[in-house]
């Protein structure tokens, strides 16, 4: 029985990895474990270059880094350049070693728990109904994912409200409000069905700014693996004036007979339509996070490594935020997105299409730096402060995210104002300006603020966004979230196992479309290994994002005080999120499940997986 890549095999694969100067991944028996990147000591005090009496040493260090830490071609699709060079390769290897160390206990638990889960369902006689999927979770996975699946995720998996509100929580990066001034209605829906479901017409919903679209039609270009199937769904959602809820209106498959489903269809037809959409959405979330958080934060930091002295305070902050970041894509290349690897074993589309998605989405959607600022992105998609439609009654991603974002920004503002007493001082920082120039030049960061930057506000925005990507945005789509919400079976399979229907009606059993016992446990165990439960006891949660002595002691008392306030704020937010309960309508944040995906006391401060 092969539930997962064994710990020994994974460790061997990673220990054999080397990134050559040309960026190709190859095998090597040499394992470099340098104690320091370049031999320069870790600073105890930070200083700007214009205030440093040993500027020559700074320049020597920067030149050495530029010579030995270089750009090499992207891996896992054509996204951002990766880290190479003699020292750069050592950094990657060092971070991979730490990553393997963190993975090992989780993988041990997941392997043991996966076998127990599989035995439990086999003892039951297999998956005979949709309710049987609960057996795969009950009493299992407490080691790898101590919190288990989100309350309400299984008991309410047929709920239309749950399906709709996941677009505003567990994967909030797809849905957008249709703008009646510039968009068109993407597909037609039977008028009688629309009136029955909404009390109005499709055109009226559109013109009032109450119609929303989540579009995965691009996946029609992808070819599923043998024995796997997928649609390429578009889904329409609407604001229901009668109930005050955000609800689904229709799902269009865009393959085969190109059927349009609505909640008025036979229950099995409609549930299958939601499952088909989720197959597309699950694929999107996992690869989008790679191109949006990993690829973007890595290249911004790599440009900083090559232009900032280790004595520069911004360098110190970035290295905290980018803890073990360069382990992920390099390891994923050999153990997750390799041909026949873990991704191929579970998802409808192979690693080839994961790479295609990353390549296609990085330059236009996932990778642009400024366009993906937290509030800017939500405004651009009409989800925040839209002038052409009513406010969303509930938006959990924004409700939780805004509090965390504001706290991060407040700390960063103090940090920047402490370093730079005026905008003029910032403009005179040659290393900082070199970083901005490098990011726009050799690093090829998409949509980065142009050089030079002239205000502290611009730097605050840059650093806040990096912190948001590494410590929050990443974990909404990855880390423990796929196990607890966005990958919970039976509603969220990684693939269909029967063809997309060519006609409606006559479906008596949805099990043929869903993974069998073995494939279900493989999916669950893969997602369990994304979690990192030990970060709580290791003080590596978001609450501790800035709590590192070298950074705090080297930048002044105001920064220490700002960190104390940040930790208090994160503690308050964590308590609020972790103690959520259902209200008297059986809802939490307007949803029939309890979402804790942004709990600062549980999620890492860094790009963990």
What are these model-derived regions, one by one?
Residues 1-21:
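Fungal secretory targeting signals
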Residues 17-609:
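Long, compositionally biased charged/polar stretches
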